[in-house]
Amino acid sequence: SEWIAQSARWIEERHSPDLSLVYLPHLDYNLQRLGPDDPRIAEDCRAIDRVAGELLKYYARRGVRTVVLSEYGITCVRRSIALNRIFRAKGWIAVKDELGRELLDCGASKVFAVADHQIAHIYVNAPALLNEVRATVEGMEGVTRVLDADAQRAEGLRHERSGDLVAFSAEDAWFTYYYWDDDRKAPDFARCVDIHRKYGYDPVELFVDPAIALPKLKIAAKLLKKALGFRMLMDMIPLDPSLVKGSHGTCPADSAEWPVLIGTGSSDDPIDAVYVHERLLAACAG
């Protein structure tokens, strides 16, 4: 976050753009790793408050209008939901065996889910199953809402790539993308930081597998192997979703855990997230 803030100042001094979008991600990591109730989060808050405060003061000295926007508030979680494993048990998921590893075959699957924290997009390739899939997901422990296309439109969520169904978890739950039943058959990328090959967001990437003895030494050995030209997998990630302590996506009951928008008006009234865009455009025009 400090490097990003310094880069933002560098760009402002050299180019003075009409619009700068600056993302300071520091809080995101430990809030998911430790959970918002962990006392260690206070130090993270102080650290990012200093970085953000210095950047805001810098822009103020240059006469730049600033808007502070948080994407989401993170809530404590204690359980995970593996939709694709349930779908597999129903016979709806197709997997390919590659050298003893299982890959999800989305095209051949009747149903599959793409996980995104506390939201899951469910794609139903067999339309005749839609009602059964919805009933199955609605009956899962930890799922609070399932929206079809019409319900998505009513809430401003319907996108051309949205799932046929969109599921929301309870505040204390989140969705994993896991689809294998045996960790020995998990794909090689499951234990790596590999966001583009996974079937959804994987917050377990924030952890090093606690079962690995001397992890720094193992990482060094892998980097040496790579430097020597050998194929190497940085497979240091655990497959234990219980490690995750914070998530987001479901609207919390406590408004203190909602995201904030500061600097676009004097009203304290909440607004739907779909209207943030026009507020930002108005701030740019004003």
Name each model feature, range by range.
Residues L243-L261:
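Short glycine/proline-rich, acidic loop/turn segments that cap or connect secondary-structure elements
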Residues S1-V68, V274-A283:
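A long, amphipathic alpha-helix that forms part
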Residues D164, L261-T264:
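Short, hydrophobic beta-strand segments
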Residues E54-L243:
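Secreted, luminal/periplasmic, and some membrane-associated catalytic domains
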Residues Y179, S266-Y275:
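Soluble, non-transmembrane catalytic domains of enzymes that act on hydrophobic metabolites at membranes
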Residues Y23, A149, T264:
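Conserved residues at the C-terminal ends of beta-strands
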Residues D18-L19, I119, E257-V260:
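Short glycine-rich loop/turn motifs
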